[in-house]
Amino acid sequence: MPSFDIVSEITLYEIRNAVENANRVLSTRYDFRGVEATIELNEKAETIKVTTESDFQLEQLIEILISACVKRDIQHNSLDIPADSEHSGKLYSKEIKLKQGIETDMAKKIIKLIKDAKLKVQTQIQGEQVRVSGKSRDDLQATIQLVKNAELGQPFQFNNFRD
């Protein structure tokens, strides 16, 4: 019986490259001359810390980071950007988390979406991924298109396709 897995993964070396590119752009921006501003990647905690002197500049820095991520084919909704910023002394900062894996609530939404479409496939949650199996490849391809076109707020990849 054919099957595949729905996963949500970000390659850390692409994130590292995006952060380095964003820092390079930051060093050439005129509006950030003489301003203490940093974009730092913590690979172990899978977070990006963005720090600068004002709230407005913080939003500008996040836009620079998002554009660098998009250039590296990392979708911006794979970054979990908090709404409010932390303020300590003269610096504002935000701790941006990277969305790795599919949480249980999101997996349940995916399964509900597939069941509501009445496709002839079986779904099951396996840790941080969703396994989809069915009798025909056409049903599996329809499932892939359904999940791709759904606005679930997280990018998904499809791997481990077996016949």
From Swiss-Prot:
This is Nucleotide-binding protein HS_0688. InterPro entries: DUF520 (IPR007551), UPF0234-like_C (IPR035571), UPF0234_N (IPR035570), YajQ-like_sf (IPR036183). The keyword Nucleotide-binding applies. Keywords: Nucleotide-binding. Pfam families: DUF520 (PF04461). It comes from the Bacteria. One of its GO terms (molecular function) is nucleotide binding. It comes from Histophilus somni (strain 129Pt). The keyword Nucleotide-binding applies. GO terms for cellular component: cytosol. Belongs to the YajQ family. Nucleotide-binding protein.
